[in-house]
């Protein structure tokens, strides 16, 4: 897995190693050991999936302590432009944003 930092601390682009041939492809979308070694120690407690029709804009979602949680976002079909905005008061990147294309072709994931 290749880990790419973004302009916002704690927001990372993850690029898995994809193994493909004429049958299709395979990649490890998550490994607790690799994640702990390259990103941070985390316990994922929830897994969600959503479907959006073409042209849909999803809202900005966030949680405040004590309900804050990290998210690992990926796309299995099509593509999205995922935008993360730093709304943490006191953060040196407060108000800044990063935009990342996530798609079935690039297999990128965004850790927020």
Where do the PLM segments sit?
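Non-catalytic, conserved peripheral segments adjacent to functional cores
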Residues: 1-108
